Amino acid sequence: MDSTFTGYNLYNLQVKTEMDKLSSGLDIYRNPLKNKTEVTMFILTGFTDDFELQVFLFLLFFAIYLFTLIGNLGLVVLVIEDSWLHNPMYYFLSVLSFLDACYSTVVTPKMLVNFLAKNKSISFIGCATQMLLFVTFGTTECFLLAAMAYDHYVAIYNPLLYSVSMSPRVYVPLITASYVAGILHATIHIVATFSLSFCGSNEIRHVFCDMPPLLAISCSDTHTNQLLLFYFVGSIEIVTILIVLISCDFILLSILKMHSAKGRQKAFSTCGSHLTGVTIYHGTILVSYMRPSSSYASDHDIIVSIFYTIVIPKLNPIIYSLRNKEVKKAVKKMLKLVYK
């Protein structure tokens, strides 16, 4: 009986020893998960602690934001209300204006609050949501600008068949595909970025949650994330810019065949406006993302990010409408109705 009891105790001791080994082995996997949940919020430090400068920046960016909303949403209303603007070219322009309004709204309100608030924190989920929307709208705009370039080519190459060539069966899928591409691209980066461990500093040297500064503060190996960022952003930039350039080349060939000076001027104006918008937008994206996240530290980088998230959405209505006679006529007509 004693020997049986002793054997039973030895068996229990062996089981306990093996369970302890298994538990210590699982700790290897538990610790990274624990580290990931240590940071529950981030601090958006911005680029200045000077209160007087922050007040000035608040007033400046608040004014820019108001102009952005008025310009872009006003253009959307204009396209909806004016029957002369009911064609694919202006539908694309209204979608771009809506995107710019959303793009700016994702970033600007939180930034304005942080200029005057002592607590500049943003929750983990809030940061992920802001980044998801920001990348979605940004990527969608890249593809939409490419679709608009193709639309301009169709309009200039054969204007008589434009309404047939660019029917709802064509332009609606182009717009939808742009949004789908934006959502997929954003989802990939959100999953990759927020699967990392953030167990050290929670201070993001930025005015909003963006990928490079987040990767810079992660305590995980971010090599894969940086490759994803480089290859995905690089591929999207190459594809969309090529579509724009090829479309513009065909537009120029079509312009050279035109006999009407008025037609040439209108075509040059349309193509020139679009190239200006594309160059400014894609140029700032390339500067911001096509380099290692470790080099992301200077105020210059923050200013570039602010430019393409806040300033460009304000400029787009001016770029695409300033030399557009149809839009000018529609604006004058609406102002007459308002002040009649």
Curated annotation (Swiss-Prot):
PROSITE patterns per the UniProt record, alphabetical: G_PROTEIN_RECEP_F1_2
Residues in the Cytoplasmic compartment per record: 77-84, 151-169, 248-267, 323-340
Transmembrane segments: 56-76, 85-105, 130-150, 170-190, 227-247, 268-288, 302-322
Pfam families with a match to the protein in the record: 7tm_4
InterPro entries: GPCR_Rhodpsn, GPCR_Rhodpsn_7TM, Olfact_rcpt
Segments on the Extracellular side according to the record's topology features: 1-55, 106-129, 191-226, 289-301
GO biological process per UniProt: G protein-coupled receptor signaling pathway; sensory perception of smell
Superkingdom of origin: Eukaryota
Stated name of the protein: Olfactory receptor 5T3
GO MF annotations, alphabetized: G protein-coupled receptor activity; odorant binding; olfactory receptor activity
Positions annotated as glycosylated: 35, 119
Entry GO CC: plasma membrane
Family of this protein: Belongs to the G-protein coupled receptor 1 family.
Annotated disulfide bonds: 127-219
Topology term for the membrane: Multi-pass membrane protein
General function of this protein: Odorant receptor.
Keyword set includes Glycoprotein: yes
Gene3D superfamilies to which the protein is assigned, alphabetical: Rhodopsin 7-helix transmembrane proteins
UniProt entry keywords in alphabetical sequence: Cell membrane, Disulfide bond, G-protein coupled receptor, Glycoprotein, Membrane, Olfaction, Receptor, Sensory transduction, Transducer, Transmembrane, Transmembrane helix
Cellular location(s): Cell membrane
